Amino acid sequence: WDEYKVSDAKAGEGFTIDADKVNGDVRVSAKFEADGTEEYKLRFADEFDGKDYSLPDAGVWHNCTRESPTWKRFTSQTAEGQQKTAFIRDGKLVTRCIKNTIAEEGDVEMISGAIESSDKMYFTYGRVEGRLRTTPHVGNFPAFWLMPQDNSAGWPNAGEIDIWEQIDTENKTYHTVHTHCTHDLHLALPNSGSTHTNAADYHVITLDWTPTLLTWYVDGTKAFSYAKTKQSFLLERGQWPYDKPFYLILNQSVGNGSWAKNCDVNFEYETLFDYVRLYQKDGEGDITSAVKDVKTSGSALDVYAQQGGLLLVAPEAQKADVYSISGTRVLSGLVQGNRFVSLTKGVYVVAGKKIVVK
């Protein structure tokens, strides 16, 4: 390979390679580093990097209650059930819905995992991003979504934002809002969009939430948007309740035939969440969180090559990206303290520096 490096490239600039120097494939790699001037800054992140089979961070999450709505009807309520249906494994949050074998869970066919950040981490506006995958099967009904911290107006008046849903065996993602205007009055439609994917693969699902617009992306490609109307008739009927704090919910549920089909009691449903992150612009909205002052720049990150991998050391929470020499990102996450990353032999790039792993 011949390499042509462009440093400090600015938006709109181009780079040309002479045709007579190209013989075969051309590989283009881009690396973007935070410099403090980026539009969106990381405000909150959970990388789910706790010990295997530990529970999600209690400073941010708690288990959802079991209630009558379809998605909540099987939610685990015992410590044993919660341990089996929402736990950390291999740097992922594992949410499951499985056959109920625990007498203390009561007379329910299945038990399901569902966690939420209400009263602990809630925010107004920003970019919410999650990397996730699910296991398509008849009755599958997982979700990554937002509900209002103040729900005194009740559902759907107070609003709901479904960042991502998938049902049954469909290779499709759904992105939806629910309000009094859309659900009860059937106005201000369409309120939902979808895009085709391979549901069994990991995808990065993103929601951009501004005072006037909701925009969904799947793997960086715009999938759907929903705007605040300027019609007083619709605003008076609750078309836009999205100007106050919402919290996160991550869950693996199953259908009852109303949308997703009836569940397969003998199947183990599973959805994995690799990470959840919140970015905001300076001065944009508020965030209340048990995790404060996450820094993305100006904090030291030391990197050491060791046998079989890299040691990353950061006194303060610092976002780290590790790339192979070909430009493939092999790690992206927060580092605080000491973190060893197992890697195969080769050359890697961290914070703009090449490091050899032997």
Which sequence ranges carry the predicted segments?
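Short, exposed beta-strand/loop patches in secreted or surface proteins that constitute
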Residues: 8, 83-88, 301-305, 333
